Amino acid sequence: MPLREFKIVVLGSGGVGKSALTVQFVQGIFVEKYDPTIEDSYRKQVEVDGQQCMLEILDTAGTEQFTAMRDLYMKNGQGFVLVYSIIAMSTFNDLPDLREQILRVKDCDDVPMVLVGNKCDLAEQRVISTEQGDELARKFGGCAFLEASAKNKINVEQIFYDLIRQINRKNPGPTNKKEKKSGGCILL
């Protein structure tokens, strides 16, 4: 079976741990130091449900920065990881507008996405409950929701694997090479 490519975009406010989640998933290391991202792209080959997948993961700047570039990320992305920090309410409140922007740019109501409450290892500093995350996911049309910790490797792989499964359900890949090459035009 051929390798299928997936374009995933990680979005959220500055400091929520987008890079930490991405680097933990791709390289298996936790980045302790906060170094604001402009844009980083990572590739990782994984197997999900028996399918070989090449993920191209775009780790973006915080939503408050580089807004002009964001429409382009959204246009090209097939699936989105929307990240907030469970210890910062403002990062949670930013997500509905971000989701609306994705739906507007994609011109679609059904876009594969996972809502992620990051930094669940800091439970004693929590200001956003798991129930609030669940409720927001329901408001987002029942999108997937996970709490994660890049530091402790909690739910990191599940975020990306769930997104791959959503993309596959929405847009199954070709079942054979002939089908992939088929196409054509109709002359009228």
From Swiss-Prot:
User: Where is this chain lipid-modified, annotation S-geranylgeranyl cysteine?
Assistant: C185
Which ranges are cleaved off as propeptide?
A: 186-188
Membrane disposition: Lipid-anchor
According to the UniProt entry, its GO molecular function terms are: G protein activity; GTP binding
Q: Which InterPro entries match?
A: P-loop_NTPase, Rap1, Small_GTP-bd, Small_GTPase, Small_GTPase_Ras-type
Q: What is its main location?
A: membrane
Q: Name one GO biological process term.
A: Rap protein signal transduction
Sites of the modification Cysteine methyl ester?
Answer: C185
Enumerate the residues binding GTP.
12-19, 59-63, 118-121
Gene3D superfamilies of this UniProt entry? P-loop containing nucleotide triphosphate hydrolases
Q: Which reaction does it catalyse?
A: GTP + H2O = GDP + phosphate + H(+)
Does Cell membrane count among this protein's keywords?
yes
Q: Which UniProt keywords apply?
A: Cell membrane, GTP-binding, Hydrolase, Lipoprotein, Membrane, Methylation, Nucleotide-binding, Prenylation
KW rRNA-binding (keyword) present: no
Q: Which Pfam families match?
A: Ras
The EC number on file is 3.6.5.2
Q: What class of enzyme is it?
A: hydrolase
Cellular localisation: Cell membrane
Q: Return the SUPFAM superfamilies for the record.
A: P-loop containing nucleoside triphosphate hydrolases (SSF52540)
Motif Effector region: chain residues: 34-42
Instruction: Quote a single Gene Ontology cellular component term.
Output: plasma membrane
Give the protein family.
Belongs to the small GTPase superfamily. Ras family.
**What's this protein's name?**
Ras-related protein Rap-1
